Amino acid sequence: VIGENAVKQLSLGGGSSELKPQKEISPLEGMIEKYGKEHILFTLGYASGEPNYSNELPSGLDADSLVQEALKVAREADVVLFFGGLNKNFQQDCEGDDRRSMDLPFGQNELIEKIIQVNPNTGVILISGNAVSMPWLSQIDGLMQSWYLGSQAGTATANIICGEANPSGKLPFSIPVKLEDNSAHYFGAESYPGVNGTQYYKDDILVGYRWHDTKKIDPLFPFGYGLSYTTFQYGKA
């Protein structure tokens, strides 16, 4: 298990949405409960710093050392599960500011690429509330979009990974290949980021999958996408 989101508390929120769960089960704790501590190796791989909503705080950990330790663990492991994505810090899934880009922050894309090179038997679990770029997608064995699942996130995630629960969710929006595939980036600066503090929503109703369908743009994952451990077929009752 590699990745800060395997251990980071993500159900807390902040400000008026702050929660204080009695116990939050992390993905790492969920995996240990299922497979036993003796079968799990863990390292951070990257670090985001303390939670903050007005500016980005450094983690205080050496990024290169975290990467090297992650590669060491990846070489020793039979299977790598990378728990990454976003969190609720500044310029991520946080109110008051846009994300800087669609890329995963803190060098995660580069780290995943390096992990795949030393252990191709790698799966990625993304914990986020929004779409991210996935340049490594074709090189991994599996992908799970985990969202923010609350205080029992670790148990739910581990149940799906070990096969005790069937993943049956469907995407509530389309995930584009790149940021420019979104309608807001088609009409120039007036639409995004705006002119003199004013944005014009020129895409009208052509947002999300409607935009992709109208402009014949293939998304990375379309609205309603979702795999499971079985197959389904529509037919007459």
Question: What are the roles of these predicted feature ranges?
Answer:
Residues T43-S138:
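Hydrophobic helix-and-loop "lid/oligomerization" segment in the mid-to-C-terminal part
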Residues V1-G15, K20-L28, I32-L41, P51-P58, ...:
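Secreted, periplasmic, or luminal enzymes acting at the cell surface/secretory milieu
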